[in-house]
């Protein structure tokens, strides 16, 4: 049995996934089906914002968010703002406070600088060029994307081999920002430290963790509370989408799935 087929055992009405490798893309399920991907949104939105940085519409270290915060702080959950409000929960740079409100704030700044709604900017700058024609932002820039496995494969391919965004920009996105910060990964508790890039959560030494325990420290990605995730590690990437909200069912199954897939990758590469 292919390791990817483990996804078919998840207790959800609909599941689909893809494994990207140097030799090609393996898929399972209806890869054209649209899903509410929740916080996997942050990966796509962060790349859209970084395109605005490349274009000079905004600067990564310009003031943004609460006093003393920058766009960099907002994108790496270091601004101190709460999850769902712009109220400061902690001082800037004090702790990794996971925040969708911070992404909404960052997207608003880009929208003002670009002179157009952020969803339009994202569509014109990133989604259309990548051919992500089933992907659209409906509401929050922190968790409002609708997408499909097919489209997220295109996004993951851009992360593996950037054609639209500059490789240096992508490298910065996958570099740990404010590396000593501790923080909580939703559903997985406090981690000291809790590494995060710009958009991308970095695996580091986190345990327990949705990516599993055998992934490389620089593996990067995100999961969504709707039962979705995307990770990139080395020359490989995985997309998994389900229509059952994240919960206790997901913790063992996601970890087992990812550990089995990564073990298979390592065995094949040896």
Predicted regions span which residues?
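Short, contiguous, well-ordered secondary-structure segments
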Residues: 84-95, 104-110
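Extracytoplasmic/secreted proteins, especially bacterial periplasmic and envelope-associated proteins
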Residues: 70-73, 101, 105, 121, ...
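Generic detector of well-ordered secondary structure
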Residues: 51, 76, 108, 128, ...
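Catalytic loop of the DD-peptidase/beta-lactamase superfamily, centered on the K-T-G motif
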Residues: 1-36, 94-95, 111, 116, ...
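Active-site helix/loop module of the DD-peptidase/beta-lactamase fold
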Residues: 35-40, 52-88, 112-144, 164, ...
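Short alpha-helix boundary/capping elements
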Residues: 23-24, 45, 79
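Active-site SXXK
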Residues: 4, 36-60, 105-111, 152, ...
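Aromatic- and histidine-enriched alpha-helix N-cap/loop-to-helix transition segments
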Residues: 35-44, 66-69, 97-104, 146-150
């Amino acid at each position: 049995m292919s390791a990817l087929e483990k996804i078919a055992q998840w207790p959800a009405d609909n599941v689909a996934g893809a494994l990207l490798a140097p030799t090609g893309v393996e898929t399972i399920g209806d890869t054209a089906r649209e899903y509410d991907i929740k916080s996997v949104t942050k990966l796509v939105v962060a790349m859209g914002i970084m395109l605005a940085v490349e274009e000079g519409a905004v600067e990564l270290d310009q003031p943004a968010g609460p006093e003393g915060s920058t766009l960099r702080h907002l994108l790496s959950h270091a601004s101190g703002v709460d999850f769902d409000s712009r109220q400061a929960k902690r001082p800037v740079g004090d702790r990794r406070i996971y925040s969708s409100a911070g992404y909404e704030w960052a997207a608003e700044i880009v929208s003002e600088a670009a002179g157009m709604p952020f969803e339009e900017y994202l569509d014109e700058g990133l989604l259309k060029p990548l051919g992500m024609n089933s992907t659209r932002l409906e509401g929050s820039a922190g968790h409002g994307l609708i997408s499909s496995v097919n489209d997220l494969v295109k996004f993951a391919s851009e992360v593996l081999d950037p054609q639209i965004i500059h490789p240096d920009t992508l490298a910065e996105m996958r570099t740990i920002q404010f590396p000593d910060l501790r923080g909580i990964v939703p559903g997985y508790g406090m981690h000291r430290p809790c590494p995060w890039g710009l958009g991308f959560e970095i695996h580091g030494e986190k345990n327990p963790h949705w990516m599993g325990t055998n992934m490389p420290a620089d593996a990067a990605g995100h999961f969504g509370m709707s039962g979705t995730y995307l990770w990139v590690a080395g020359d490989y990437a995985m997309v998994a989408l389900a229509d059952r909200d994240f919960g206790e069912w997901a913790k063992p199954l996601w970890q087992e799935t990812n550990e089995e897939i990564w073990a298979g990758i390592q065995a094949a590469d040896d």
